[in-house]
Regions:
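Cytosolic, membrane-interface loops and tails of multi-pass inner-membrane proteins
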Residues: 22-54, 185-202
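Short, non-helical or kinked segments that cap or interrupt transmembrane helices
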Residues: 29-38, 98-111, 138-146
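C-terminal ends of transmembrane helices
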Residues: 19-22, 92-102, 129-136, 181-185
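Multi-pass membrane catalytic core of lipid/isoprenoid biosynthesis enzymes
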Residues: 46-73
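Interfacial segments of multi-pass membrane proteins
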Residues: 45-49, 72-75, 88, 92, ...
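Helix-coil boundary and interhelical linker segments in multi-pass alpha-helical membrane proteins
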Residues: 1-9, 67-84, 115-122, 155-168
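Hydrophobic alpha-helical transmembrane segments
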Residues: 4-9, 54-55, 82-87, 111, ...
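N-terminal signal-anchor transmembrane alpha helix
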Residues: 1-27
């Protein structure tokens, strides 16, 4: 029962579309009608050009899955229950009940969940994203690389004892690939939008 409760709690918390809400409150309207149509951090930056809204969206999207995992771990005294809650948080972000199950791609939520459940893996995944972004300037490629390497990081540090994390992170990496289908196609065709680090934002 603790697993089901944690999964549902994580899902409903993850379903809160912070990027959409923040953009509405800031006067930008429905972010789903602009840019890539996504409700996540990258599209918030693309549409608003505001670092404050982008950073807040990143923190809240990462935090909701991470918080769900930490709270479930604390309440039930089980790391595996916390892992399930974190998974629920990512699923909620990707398939929010409030938006007809049409949500984001779950990168920030996944990284937040990893930081909460297996900190060393979360840190390495974040660093991987940064390095890839600096080298190739593709947000999607950076995310896919970071999340795909996470299961290997978990196994490298935990061995057989880390199998629950390896499986969970592998599932999230696969989910991310599915959510990034259009990005992968654009990468292959050389049409993916690059991150412009030189462009000034407010």
């Amino acid at each position: 029962m603790s697993y089901l409760i944690s999964l549902l709690f994580g899902y409903f918390l993850g379903s809160v579309p912070f990027g959409l809400v923040l953009c509405y409150l800031a006067g930008y309207g429905d972010i789903r009608k602009s840019g890539s149509g996504n409700i996540g951090t990258t599209n918030v930056l693309r549409v608003t050009k505001r670092k404050d809204l982008t950073l807040l969206t990143l923190i809240l999207d990462a935090g909701k899955a991470g918080f769900a995992a930490l709270l479930a771990t604390y309440l039930f005294g089980s790391a595996s229950v916390g892992l399930v809650a974190g998974l629920g948080g990512v699923l909620g972000h990707n398939f929010p009940i409030w938006l007809n199950f049409k949500g984001g791609k779950g990168v920030a939520s996944t990284l937040g969940m990893m930081l909460a459940t297996y900190p060393v893996v979360g840190v390495l995944a974040c660093l991987t994203w940064v390095v890839m972004a600096l080298l190739f300037k593709y947000s999607s490629l950076s995310a896919l690389t970071a999340l795909s390497l996470a299961p290997f990081y978990a196994y490298a540090f935990g061995g057989a004892a880390a199998y629950p994390y390896v499986l969970a992170f592998a599932f999230l990496a696969l989910l991310s690939m599915i959510r990034h289908r259009a990005n992968i196609e654009r990468l292959i065709n050389g049409q993916e939008t690059k991150i412009n680090f030189k462009k000034k934002v407010k």
